[in-house]
Amino acid sequence: MAKIYFTLTGTRHYYGSDFLKSGMKIQLEKEPDNKYDPEAIQVKLKGMGKIGYVANSPYTMIGESMSARRIYDKIDDQANAKVVMVTPNGTLCKLSKKSLVSYTE
């Protein structure tokens, strides 16, 4: 299976992105009660809580990263990921293969 990349967005509403570094482990958690987007996936960092969301708009996504809508059914309620690269336009992250619903060893 191909690697799944996504863009972490909205960090300016929480802690900013200056603390984010390549290789950092992050957690994804579905937020079905989100009043703006029923397929919202929040991004959390241990010890800090919510730091942003998986981008769901082509305007906030970097390159060929997947939207929250495309990832939503590929994961359970929670998933693991890592930061790949921090840019001025957003943070590129990679979903852990083991977090995929279809994952088998």
What are these regions (language model features)?
Residues 1-105:
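Conserved active-site motif detector
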